[in-house]
A protein has these predicted regions:
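Conserved donor-binding/catalytic core segment of Leloir-type glycosyltransferases
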Residues: 9, 188-205, 211-214
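Short His-centered aromatic/hydrophobic patch
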Residues: 89-95
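A short, well-ordered alpha-helix in the C-terminal region of glycosyltransferases
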Residues: 223, 329, 336, 343-357, ...
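Nucleotide-activated donor-binding/catalytic signature segment of Leloir-type glycosyltransferases, i.e.
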Residues: 236-262, 270
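Short hydrophobic beta-strand element within catalytic cores of glycosyltransferases
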Residues: 291, 296, 300-303, 313
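Conserved acidic donor-binding segment of nucleotide-sugar-dependent glycosyltransferases
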Residues: 314-316, 320-327, 336-342
């Protein structure tokens, strides 16, 4: 792959855990290791990660980097040290505010956007920050959905291209042949019709609606269970809510290892995350890579219609799109798939085929490499 020498500058990078971290690392890993380097903040386990990385990592002492004069100085030093032809900022805010200073010295830059840039682009004060950070950018790759790209476009100067780059799923990691029986045994849900939800436990993701949907689901599909994977600030509320669900119908797996995560997707008969928009539309789901990962494991998906989430599925073919605030609609969609295993399996197979065809990480890396060359 022909790629100019590229320095990724980001606050979000492994061994930190998160969707942006996984996206950026998946892209870097698919670029030639001698043509890419990463400048990122300190993190627990960072030294071990950096030693194992096949590319250079300029790990900074701070836990979070702000666009301050000292960080600017170190950034310019890293550009010179690595001999970078182009800089890719992992997010528009805050570090891409250093981008115009790079352009002044002749180093082009790209500023990536994710779901967070949605509200940055619509709020008056932060709208101006987005415009300033991207004022001299060669391009703004939106690494989530066309929905987010349309909103970001309103904050980016007209002469700066804004392009969509859908995240992918690692097809060697997320696949249909994974064993999972030990996991269902561990959580006491073996041989039950199983719904799996993988996500951070926050209100937008809709775990509360899934819990409320369990009584009607169980009326149609006896013994159906919900396995909630992940942790977050909403956990205590969800545990209290689950106490009112049918006995044994809701199980919390907590945070699981990256190695086991694909097997949890595979353990379910249906994957569901009925995400919903909140705060009058200020909080939306930018994309939802969990839907792609579940589909890559050949499981049908039930997707809440918030923001760009609908772009992750082919409705009626690879899964079902629902109003994530409507308990009855969510229960009907999930229950219909649990009650019809043949239909669910067909959707799962179609989902895997769609991910293979259109959402592999190698495809995304080639797209990014093209934009880096054009910069």
């Amino acid at each position: 792959m022909d790629v100019p020498r590229t320095l990724l500058v980001t606050n979000d990078y492994p061994p930190q855990v998160g969707g942006i971290q996984r996206t950026l690392e998946a892209l870097v890993r698919r670029l030639p290791p001698n043509r890419v380097a990463v400048l990122c903040p300190n993190a627990e386990g960072g030294d071990a990660f950096d030693r194992a990385a096949p590319y250079a990592v300029y790990r900074q002492p701070e836990r979070f980097l702000w666009p301050l004069p000292e960080v600017r100085r170190r950034l310019h030093q890293a550009v010179r040290s690595f001999g970078a032809d182009v800089v890719l900022f992992g997010a528009v805010y805050p570090l891409a505010l250093l981008g115009p200073s790079l352009a002044e010295t002749g180093t082009p830059y790209l500023a990536a956007a994710h779901g967070f840039e949605y509200w940055l682009s619509i709020a008056p004060g932060t709208h101006a920050l987005v415009r300033r950070a991207t004022s001299r950018a060669a391009r703004v790759p939106v690494m989530c959905s066309a929905f987010i790209a349309r909103v970001v476009r309103t904050a980016v100067p007209d002469d700066v291209p804004v392009s969509v780059m859908y995240p992918g799923a690692d097809l060697e990691v997320f696949r249909p042949d994974l064993p999972y029986e030990d996991l269902t045994d561990l959580h006491g849900v073996a041989d039950r019709p199983l719904i799996v939800c993988v996500s951070r436990l926050v209100a937008r993701k809709g775990q509360d609606v899934l819990i409320r949907a369990m009584p009607p689901i169980r009326r149609d599909v006896p013994d159906a269970s919900l396995l909630i994977v992940g942790d977050g600030p909403d956990r205590d509320r969800l545990v209290r809510l689950a106490a009112d669900a049918p006995n044994g119908s809701v199980v919390f797996a907590g945070q699981v290892s990256e190695g086991d995560l694909p097997r949890y997707y595979r353990a379910g008969n249906v994957f569901a995350m009925p995400c919903r928009s909140r705060l009058g539309g200020l909080e939306v789901e930018g994309w939802g890579n969990v839907f792609l990962e579940a589909a890559a494991c050949a499981r049908p998906v039930v997707v809440g219609d918030s923001g760009g989430a609908r772009e992750s599925l082919a409705p009626g073919e690879t899964g079902l799109l629902v109003n994530g605030s409507d308990v009855a609609e969510v229960a009907g969609a999930v229950g219909s798939l649990l009650a019809d295993p043949e239909r669910a399996d067909a959707m799962g197979r179609a989902g895997r085929e769609r991910v293979v065809r259109a959402f592999g990480w190698s495809r995304a890396a080639e797209q990014l490499a093209g934009w880096l060359r054009e910069a």
